[in-house]
């Protein structure tokens, strides 16, 4: 992946996350549920003052420091390894974008805007940045696991 594409991808993903959050705040009342695809998913505007699954509520400064450390580590790892694997770079782009997307909310609003509710399973309400983080971390785990087992494909 060309070096210029990395910051462009990160900015585009952050932009999408922030656009969705702004749309939700402007168009859905707090705690309102809108059935987008009945039985599949709804949009529900929540203000999450904790982490995933609403743990560690009202720990803003802890999350700000943790996010800066994680993003810093991911950026450092990317700079050191960006030519190693496109999949590795993609995983780090997702982690960095998701971290920054939620960081913006936490610093600017004091909470993270969540909105995606899966209706077919009992699961926490989440946002676009959370999706980036989840996919990025799972992809990174898979890559590191494959490297650990000697399979570099």
Swiss-Prot record:
The active site is at residues 114, 130. It is a multi-pass membrane protein. The keyword Cell membrane applies. GO terms for cellular component: plasma membrane. The chain crosses the membrane at residues 61-81, 85-105, 125-145. It catalyses: Release of signal peptides from bacterial membrane prolipoproteins. Hydrolyzes -Xaa-Yaa-Zaa-|-(S,diacylglyceryl)Cys-, in which Xaa is hydrophobic (preferably Leu), and Yaa (Ala or Ser) and Zaa (Gly or Ala) have small, neutral side chains. InterPro entries: Peptidase_A8. GO terms for biological process: proteolysis. Its EC number is 3.4.23.36. PROSITE patterns: SPASE_II. One of its GO terms (molecular function) is aspartic-type endopeptidase activity. It comes from the Bacteria. It is found in: Cell membrane. The keyword Cytoplasm does not apply. HAMAP family: LspA. NCBIfam families: lspA. Belongs to the peptidase A8 family. This is Lipoprotein signal peptidase. It comes from Streptococcus thermophilus (strain ATCC BAA-491 / LMD-9).
């Amino acid at each position: 992946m060309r070096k210029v594409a990395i910051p462009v991808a990160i900015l585009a993903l952050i932009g999408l996350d922030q656009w969705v959050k702004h749309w939700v705040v402007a168009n859905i009342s707090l705690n309102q549920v809108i059935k987008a695809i009945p039985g599949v998913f709804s949009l529900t505007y929540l203000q999450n003052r904790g982490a995933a699954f609403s743990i560690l509520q009202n720990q803003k400064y802890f999350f700000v420091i943790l996010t800066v450390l994680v993003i810093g580590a991911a950026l450092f790892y990317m700079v050191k390894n960006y030519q190693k694997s496109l999949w590795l770079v993609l995983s780090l782009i997702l982690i960095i974008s998701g971290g920054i997307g939620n960081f913006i909310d936490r610093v600017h609003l004091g909470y993270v805007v969540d909105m995606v509710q899966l209706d077919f399973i009992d699961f926490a309400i989440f946002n676009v940045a959370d999706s980036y983080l989840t996919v990025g971390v799972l992809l990174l785990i898979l890559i590191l696991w494959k490297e650990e087992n000697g399979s570099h494909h």
